[in-house]
Amino acid sequence: MKKEEWILPYIKQNARLFVLVIFLGAVTIFSAAFLMFTSGFLISKAATRPENILLIYVPIVAVRTFGIARSVSRYVERLVGHHIILKIVSDMRVRLYNMLEPGALMLRSRFRTGDMLGILSEDIEHLQDAFLKTIFPAISALLLYAVSVIALGFFSWPFAILLALYLFVLVVLFPVVSLLVTRAKNAKLKSGRNVLYSRLTDAVMGVSDWMFSGRRHAFIDAYEKEERDWFELERKKQRFTRWRDFAAQCLVAGLILLMLFWTAGQQADGELAKTMIAAFVLVVFPLTEAFLPLSDALGEVPGYQDSIRRMNNVAPQPEASQTESGDQILDLQDVTLAFRDVTFSYDNSSQVLHNFSFTLRQGEKMALLGRSGSGKSTSLALIEGALKPDSGSVTLNGVETALLKDQIADAVAVLNQKPHLFDTSILNNIRLGNGEASDEDVRRAAKQVKLHDYIESLPDGYHTSVQETGIRFSGGERQRIALARILLQDTPIIILDEPTVGLDPITERELMETVFEVLKGKTILWITHHLAGVEAADKIVFLENGKTEMEGTHEELLAANERYRRLYHLDVPVK
């Protein structure tokens, strides 16, 4: 399935059900039309005071039949239509997730949280309206348009042609004009809604910052102003919509008068019975009800196109998903991680890494230092295979990481700033590192990270729920649970991605001592932005502006590099 196609493939996959929905929609409209037609005939016939009820028994039965048929077909149409749409939306969500997953590690660098939430919720939901409010009604209305003109042709071809031209204004001209007028308005509304979504999401996630800075009123005022501007655009669009609908209703009124004039003429010429005048006039109402929504339906097309564009944009960048044919088998014995003249940039922007190189052999510990934005997180994404360098190579035992796919998880484990803990037991959270681990294996890992005694002191022990995101535990305890998970995973390479951020100095020191103690013999890449504890590393690489600024052991740099010495003493003051 091509990534650009979010409508046609699903129509092809569900073609029979789509035909059924359109058929049921047509049956509903025609039942409503015949209901009004027979009702008009019945009223007129009853007004002639027939001598016997049997003379109007057939139209009475027809009214009842078409009334029931209209209700039943409408119900079944909605039932089948929503069944299809819910299935399609479900498939779309899975497809969108599969597009997101290969580049999941870099989503935060490509999208703001609010934008991503808008894509995952609003854009997917918006596309279901493409079927329910545009495709189904449009096809049913066009089918009705053709059948109505042909049916009227059996009575009078000149009037049928006149009616076709008249309805053409309602079926084609009005929707096209509506599309042209509302395209720009819809684009601004969609863009404004996405901005509001993003702003509000960011504000909710950073509400403490707004509160502590004392600028919450400034944010609220600015947000409310943007919201008022958005509602003003919405009012302008609604104003146009009301005038357009009023004009359409005037056209319908003209059509009713036209039908009344024609039927009166036909009756005067003896071509039509008096009892048929009301029937022909009343049938106009349900028919035009099917045509009126077309303007709104076509006016929403630009919104659907924008949703499709935004959903296609979540596809991973070529470097994030590019793989070559043929599976690469990684030897997990004595794994060596190597960066060789790696250069990388995002979307042809300035280079994040430039000719960056280092080699980390089995059992070595390396600290990768650098300020925010220096390329540390990009280096991590390259190691995990989420990105591919523009030039140079990132390899594990000579195999490029971008080709290893799921094998990366067998070679590399990451202890990051905020390890995710699921709302289940401690036992299950630790066992995520190895689904085949026994309860005893989990307890052994917990003992190694010095968490066993604390867990046993809890009322439910290892079956204690950590609650959503692990809020039951402190930052240091969450990191120890994640570390126990890594021990069960038992990978040769461990990446520490600033795991002590947000911890107090004592907890930080104790955690790092535990980390280096339990990971003895493992290859460790410690990504950090400050120098406390780096003396435990076998070598240090200082990354700045994508290039290696300093490299060596702690002792070598402390003795020979004045800048390193100054930075170290800032983080670790001389006693």
Curated annotation (Swiss-Prot):
Residue numbers binding ATP: G370, R371, S372, G373, S374, G375, K376, S377
GO CC field: plasma membrane
One of the record's GO molecular function terms: ATP hydrolysis activity
Domain ABC transmembrane type-1: 19-303
This protein's record includes keyword Lipoprotein: no
A Pfam family assignment: ABC_tran
PROSITE patterns: ABC_TM1F, ABC_TRANSPORTER_1, ABC_TRANSPORTER_2
Spans traversing the lipid bilayer: 17-37, 53-73, 135-155, 161-181, 246-266, 275-295
Gene Ontology BP annotations: amino acid transport; cell redox homeostasis; glutathione transmembrane transport
Keywords, comma-separated and alphabetical: Amino-acid transport, ATP-binding, Cell membrane, Membrane, Nucleotide-binding, Translocase, Transmembrane, Transmembrane helix, Transport
EC number(s) reported in the record: 7.4.2.-
CDD domains for this protein: ABCC_cytochrome_bd (cd03247)
InterPro entries documented for this protein: AAA+_ATPase (IPR003593), ABC1_TM_dom (IPR011527), ABC1_TM_sf (IPR036640), ABC_CydC/D (IPR014223), ABC_transporter-like_ATP-bd (IPR003439), ABC_transporter-like_CS (IPR017871), P-loop_NTPase (IPR027417), Type_1_exporter (IPR039421)
Topology in the lipid bilayer: Multi-pass membrane protein
Domains: entry comment: In CydD the ATP-binding domain (NBD) and the transmembrane domain (TMD) are fused.
Xref: PANTHER family: ATP-BINDING CASSETTE SUB-FAMILY B MEMBER 10, MITOCHONDRIAL, ATP-DEPENDENT PERMEASE MDL1, MITOCHONDRIAL
Assembly, per entry: Forms a heterodimer with CydC.
Protein family according to the UniProt entry: Belongs to the ABC transporter superfamily. Cysteine exporter (TC 3.A.1.129.1) family.
Name of the featured protein: Glutathione/L-cysteine transport system ATP-binding/permease protein CydD
Species, as recorded: Bacillus subtilis (strain 168)
